[in-house]
UniProtKB/Swiss-Prot annotation:
TM segment ranges: 44-64
Protein task: Transfers the sialyl group (N-acetyl-alpha-neuraminyl or NeuAc) from CMP-NeuAc onto glycoproteins and glycolipids, forming an alpha-2,6-linkage. Produces branched type disialyl structures by transfer of a sialyl group onto the GalNAc or GlcNAc residue inside backbone core chains having a terminal sialic acid with an alpha-2,3-linkage on Gal. ST6GalNAcVI prefers glycolipids to glycoproteins, predominantly catalyzing the biosynthesis of ganglioside GD1alpha from GM1b.
Tissue note: Expressed in kidney, in proximal tubule epithelial cells. Expressed in colon cell lines.
GO cellular component, one term: cytoplasm
Organism of origin: Homo sapiens
Membership in a protein family: Belongs to the glycosyltransferase 29 family.
GO process annotations (BP): cell-cell recognition; ganglioside biosynthetic process; glycoprotein metabolic process; glycosphingolipid biosynthetic process; glycosphingolipid metabolic process; glycosylceramide metabolic process; oligosaccharide biosynthetic process; oligosaccharide metabolic process
Name of the protein this chain belongs to: Alpha-N-acetylgalactosaminide alpha-2,6-sialyltransferase 6
One Pfam family, short name: Glyco_transf_29
């Protein structure tokens, strides 16, 4: 009922309720529509977030279980690196004396450590080569009929330094003309305590004619960059190490006009070899691990400290025509 008295004397409670100050009263139907719209927006955001999280989980799972295939090679339009233009002077640091790594050879042979060389009687042919390159602690004593004796260069991994220097009569005195090229991460080669460089320098005091070089830190990065450029894979992210074979092949291409590789199998060898046939990984370790078991385990391992041997061989195959590389025993391109 309306108040018959003046407005100032009317009770406030007698006034009809109105909307709060500053707010506009909305019709009930509109409020319902807005509430429904807000719910739909929240649902859409939830669905999008759920989809993104699911995609991330699946991607992480696939990445963790990814097989290291050569399928993701460098882009076809990418111009390959010309290894012939790499600077020898900047890439290899003298450990003993102040010399520069001797280069060039017209014709080089790489003698692999493969047991495929056993029984080949290639020794005389290898001896006639202008320059002969061997790896790590692969001996010639007792195997010269198949692998020869001549050693112009020996490429040695940081993990094989002690195995080589413990047998100086085999690796230093037997072929005094040998030039040693040691490779390894700077943390291994030049760490403050127990530096491998110091170990090699002490050996040089005992054998003054020994000539040795280390792959420089800058060149080590180039080797990594080369692998990433050729395969599309980052070595560190794939939890692997480049093999001594990788370093040896690149060094041979740098130093030599033509390269003949003995004993290295093609990348598809293990998929075609009869399962019951066993071949030792090294010719000088007849009871050592099987060749294909070693290749396959290293290729697919995700636990680190492994080599991608098969992937590297595919890269070598792509280099064959580009750099004049020949493979034999077995023969392939």
């Amino acid at each position: 009922m309306a108040c018959s008295r003046p407005p100032s004397q009317c009770e406030p409670t007698s006034l009809p309720p109105g909307p709060p100050a500053g707010r506009r009263h909305l019709p009930l139907s509109r409020r319902r529509r807005e509430m429904s719209s807000n719910k739909e927006q929240r649902s859409a955001v939830f669905v999008i977030l759920f989809a993104l999280i699911t995609i991330l989980i699946l991607y992480s799972s696939n990445s963790a279980n990814e097989v290291f295939h050569y399928g993701s090679l460098r882009g076809r339009s990418r111009r390959p690196v010309n290894l012939k233009k790499w600077s020898i002077t900047d890439g290899y640091v003298p450990i003993l004396g102040n010399k520069t790594l001797p280069s060039r050879c017209h014709q080089c042979v790489i003698v692999s450590s493969s047991s495929h060389l056993l029984g080949t009687k290639l020794g005389p042919e290898i001896e006639r080569a202008e320059c002969t390159i061997r790896m790590n602690d692969a001996p010639t004593t007792g195997y010269s009929a198949d692998v020869g004796n001549k050693t112009t260069y020996r490429v040695v991994a940081h993990s094989s330094v002690f195995r080589v220097l413990r047998r100086p009569q085999e690796f230093v005195n037997r072929t005094p003309e040998t030039v040693f090229i040691f490779w390894g991460p700077p943390s291994k080669m030049q760490k403050p305590q127990g530096s491998l460089v110091r170990v090699i320098q002490r050996a040089g005091l005992v054998f003054p004619n020994m000539e040795a070089y280390a792959v420089s830190p800058g060149r080590m990065r180039q080797f990594d960059d080369l692998f990433r450029g050729e395969t599309g894979k980052d070595r560190e992210k794939s939890h692997s190490w480049l093999s001594t074979g990788w370093f040896t092949m690149v060094i041979a291409v740098e130093l030599c006009d033509h390269v003949h590789v003995y004993g290295m199998v093609p990348p598809n060898y293990c998929s075609q070899r009869p399962r019951l046939q066993r071949m030792p990984y090294h010719y000088y370790e007849p009871k050592g691990p099987d060749e294909c078991v070693t290749y396959i385990q290293n290729e697919h391992s995700r636990k680190g400290n492994h080599h991608r041997f098969i992937t590297e061989k595919r890269v070598f195959s792509s280099w064959a025509q580009l750099y004049g590389i020949t493979f034999s025993h077995p023969s392939w391109t």
